[in-house]
Amino acid sequence: MTEYKLVVVGAGGVGKSALTIQLIQNHFVDEYDPTIEDSYRKQVVIDGETCLLDILDTAGQEEYSAMRDQYMRTGEGFLCVFAINNTKSFEDIHHYREQIKRVKDSEDVPMVLVGNKYDLPTRTVDTKQAQDLARSYGIPFIETSAKTRQGVDDAFYTLVREIRKHKEKMSKEGKKKKKKSKTKCILM
């Protein structure tokens, strides 16, 4: 069974824990209790393949930013979460993405942009803004509501699909490099 290491990042209060707990335990946590770091595991079937999701729910608060490099190193894919009623959390996505790319030392890291709190009427981040940002990053965008469960499975499953595509691409590039290195050298 394939295991996928998923990391949920974003500013404090955007609903990272609520999304994760909704996926794992099928219930909505409405009281806010800032996370330092929580880890969850769940076996799921995605596109006919049984897999184990190892999900790291991270601290959004700035005082825990020193811990970020460590968990970003081990993550294979990242859910970059903002709240649709919090423009600052949307603007912060750029910083999380840059930090992930720096720590992973790669421009090509599996990510999904997630606009959470879709159930709230007080929207300040337009869907089109988020779609445009995701398009500029070359990553999928999904709107979710941890409260109603809308888009929750889709967000995590899409990230697994992005990781699979990334692994396939890396494996093809590895094979191309091996083929190139098999050229013969003739000495005269």
Curated annotation (Swiss-Prot):
Leader sequence segment: none
GO cellular component term of the entry, any: cytoplasmic side of plasma membrane
Topology in membrane: Lipid-anchor
Motif Effector region, residue range(s) on this chain: 32-40
Pro-peptide region(s): 186-188
Catalytic activities: GTP + H2O = GDP + phosphate + H(+)
Source organism, top-level taxon: Eukaryota
Compartments in which it is found: Cell membrane; Cytoplasm
EC number: 3.6.5.2
Protein name per the record: GTPase KRas
Organism of derivation: Kryptolebias marmoratus (Mangrove killifish)
